[in-house]
Structures are given as C-alpha cells and as structure tokens.
Amino acid sequence: MSIDNYDWLKEIYKNIDFDKLPHGIIISGSKGLGKRLLANEIATKILSKKLDSNELALINSNNHPDFFKLDKEKILLHHITYRKDKWDDEKGQRNVNDFLSVTPSISNNKVALILNAQTMNAECQNALLKSLEEPAKNTFIIIVTDRNKSLLLSLIHI
C-alpha cells in the first residue's frame, strides 16, 4: 500500500526536503490517519533514492539490512537496547541501538522505524536518547505515535 490514494499524505510527502532531513523524525496523530504509510514512504526514500526494485522488495519484506522496523504492541527496553537474558524471538538479540551503531550495508543510510512509540516507558525512551543525541553518520530514526504527549520532552526536543 502506498500514499498515492491519500491526498493529505501526498501533500505532506511532497513538501519534505530530503536533502535537509533531520536524523530524528516524529510522526504523530490520531489512529487511522496513515502515519505508518507516510513513515514507510519516508524510510523508503531515505534508503533508496533511485527506487531500485530489488531494494524496494527488501524494504517491503522487512529484510533490508539497513532498515529496522520495530512494530510491537508494547515496546520494551530490550527492543531498544541490549539487556542480558532478554531474547526477542522475532529478531534474536537485535535491537534499535545495536542496529544504529553499525555502518550501512547496501545503502548510503540506515533507518530505524519505531511504530507504537506511545507504548515506550520512560526507561525505553531514555535508552533511545543517546542514539538521538549522538547519531551515527547517515542514520535516521522515525518515531510514529498516536499520543505525542506520551513521549518525554527530552525525546521530542532533540
């Protein structure tokens, strides 16, 4: 699914200056507005400026080595940073901070897309702060939330 059927998303997307994109992006709004679609389009553009069909297939199947999509009903600390004895059945020990610490593999950039960010507690958000405050070169973090007020001010103002 793409933003082509949603005029309001196309309008937002076409006004994004990808040459001046900040490394941290928060997309916030009510459920059902298309935030996930917009976030996926932005991530795709960051990773694949030429829109190569092979890269698009990797992104769409969540198998792109430079794309990390965190889509959990509740985001826990071990999803953001490594904690001993915590195992993620879906991705092994892979977490956002570890992913962002490695240089890009096949793209010029890396993107971590965090969905349902409103479910992160303060400890999770603080663990993410270091990656936002001191981003590695060519890394982008896209945070999607239904409730902007659930995010720490320190996270929002970076």
Question: Could you say what each language-model-derived stretch is?
Answer:
Residues 108-111, 136-142:
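Loop/turn-to-beta-strand initiation segments
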